[in-house]
Structures are given as C-alpha cells and as structure tokens.
From Swiss-Prot:
InterPro entries: EMC8/9 (IPR005366), MPN (IPR037518)
Protein name, entry field: ER membrane protein complex subunit 8/9 homolog
Locations listed in the record: Endoplasmic reticulum membrane
CDD domains (alphabetical): MPN_UPF0172 (cd08060)
Transmembrane segments: none
UniProt keyword annotation of Hydrolase present: no
Family matches, as Pfam families: UPF0172
Assembly and binders: Component of the ER membrane protein complex (EMC).
Residue intervals of the MPN domain: 4-140
KW Endoplasmic reticulum (keyword) present: yes
UniProtKB keywords: Endoplasmic reticulum, Membrane
Length: 203
C-alpha cells in the first residue's frame, strides 16, 4: 500500500489554479522525487495544465512532453494528475475531466496518484486540505481507490495558502493555456517555489 506526502509548493499551486478559475474545470500534473521513501511518494511540485480544453489533445501531448523534459532536468518524475471539476458537488474521480491523462501517467509510474480538488472545501478560510487523493493499488480490483495522504507542515501550509488566497496570489499563477496565449508567461511558476512565508511578503 502506497501513501502520499504533498508539499506546500505542490498544494499551493494546485489550489491557486482551482481558485483562479472557480467557474471552470482545471487540471495539471504532479511531480515527485524519482526515488520514493519506502512506501511513500512525496509530491514536490505541481504544473498547471489547462482551464479551457482539458482533454487529451495535440496540445496536451506537447505539454506532457515539455513537462516530462522539465521533470527530468530537475531530477523528478511525473507522478500524478490533479483536477478540479467544474460542478461544485463533484469530488470523485469519475466526475473529473480528462481522467485518461491520469491513466496514461499510471502506465508509466505505477504508484501514480490522482488528486481531486474538493470544491466544497475551497474557501478563503482554508482550515482543511481541499483535496482527495486516489491511487491504483494492484490488489484492490478498483481502478482508482482512495489513498492516504499527508500535507507537509499542514497547519502552516493551510494558514499560508489561506492568507495568499485572500490577497489574490492565485491571479499570478500561469497554466499552459496562459502560456499558449502569451509564450513569455512561465508555466513552471518558479516564483511560487519559495516558502509560503517568503511569498506572503510579495502580496
């Protein structure tokens, strides 16, 4: 059985992506260290994909190749997929867009996870992790089953994300749709890679 640890950086980016487009579905990829710690996969970064056309398209294929190359340079691996459904009440895998992308990732990384943003927990008073994590345990018989996860420095991360949401930090996040509209915009969102405490000084 595999469980997951989600870094503050990865969590902040995927939450900011969902918060930037609250009335649209969004999706993205999750990156992890190449070597897992025992049965734990540590998700260290998130790369926002799309908020317009979320399905497997030529542009999605290009994005996957670019992100794979980026991960390789950073010593990371594509280890998961995240999605925020458009419908407020949908928080299950079968209700999320472009699940085939998650299936494709799982073919290449057997311990891949599928993170679903729980819209009901997406509030400015961010006191609980607004995600559910799923994986494909080989012995369960289920395609995607709920998995255990921990949020790195949970209390500080939730407090920091909450404060940054209130200050509008999500407006500066760049996804691949934004990058395609303006190639000068950086889809790696390097400015979000600093600790949340330091990031708060910018807003």
């Amino acid at each position: 059985m595999c469980d997951y640890k989600v870094s503050e950086r990865a969590y902040a980016k995927l939450i900011f992506h969902a918060a930037k487009y609250p009335h649209q579905a969004v999706n993205g990829l999750l990156l992890a260290e190449k070597t897992s710690k025992g049965s734990q996969v540590e998700i260290v970064d998130a790369i926002p994909l799309f908020h317009q056309c979320l399905y497997v398209t030529p542009m999605a294929e290009v994005a996957l190749m670019l992100i794979d190359a980026h991960a390789e340079r950073e010593g990371l691996v594509i280890a998961g997929y995240y999605a925020a459904p458009e419908n407020f009440y949908d928080n299950q895998v079968d209700k999320t867009p472009a699940a085939k992308i998650a299936d494709k990732i799982q073919e290449n990384f057997k311990n891949a996870c599928f993170v679903v943003v729980d819209n009901k927990l997406m509030t400015l008073q961010h006191d609980r992790a607004a995600i559910q994590v799923f994986n494909c345990p080989g012995d369960s018989g289920a395609r995607w089953s709920k998995a255990k996860f921990t949020l790195s420095q949970a209390s500080d991360t939730l407090e920091g994300v909450s404060l940054l949401l209130k200050r509008g930090a999500m407006r500066d996040l760049v996804d691949f749709d934004n990058h395609l509209d303006n190639p000068d915009k950086n889809w790696t969102n390097d400015f979000l890679n600093q600790p949340l405490n330091d990031l708060q000084k910018l807003y």
